[in-house]
Amino acid sequence: MVVHGRSGGLVPECLSSLIDDLQAKRSAPVQLQALTAEECPYLPDRPILLLPLLLWPGCHARHDVPAIRERLRSDGAKVTMLPFLGAWPLWWRLVVSSVQCQLEPDSVLVHHPLREGVADRFLTMLSASFSLPLVSFDRWPEHQTQHPDARPIPLALAPNRMTESLYQVDGSPPLLEDPLIRQGLLDLLAFLP
């Protein structure tokens, strides 16, 4: 599993505990690689299923994770890479159903800033799926000024600077801190080959 991680390769507890639970549920080793950490060694006697636990079609999903795949292959590993988590329709259905249960007037989805282009179509589709406005975190202060009653729902798997900042203005917790979303993701991951 590839995750973004925090400075120095730190991985939030909700991600490391998810990996521990997944390992127990699958009865198979699951390694965690944070993009912010040193490269982790692979188990040479096993094929690797590489899954980016990333929500957005940004540079990490399009460039960094394929580079990890190529590094592993050049080290002799047999690697199958799955699409990043945000490309899974079942994942978003799970998130949409959970978010719909906690909606309040003036709810707005807040996402990690992305470059224009490929992400635009993705974000338009996502906004339509939720039937909610979607605001980039770098535009949140302006949105909040124009809509002082807006209640942010951060679209982030784990705690990060965005979720911590939005929590100060009554934002929802990260997605993996919602028990239904966490269990749903665990079930989805357990059924992978």
Predicted segments, located by residue:
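Active-site-proximal alpha-helix that buttresses catalytic centers in soluble enzyme cores
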Residues: 1-193
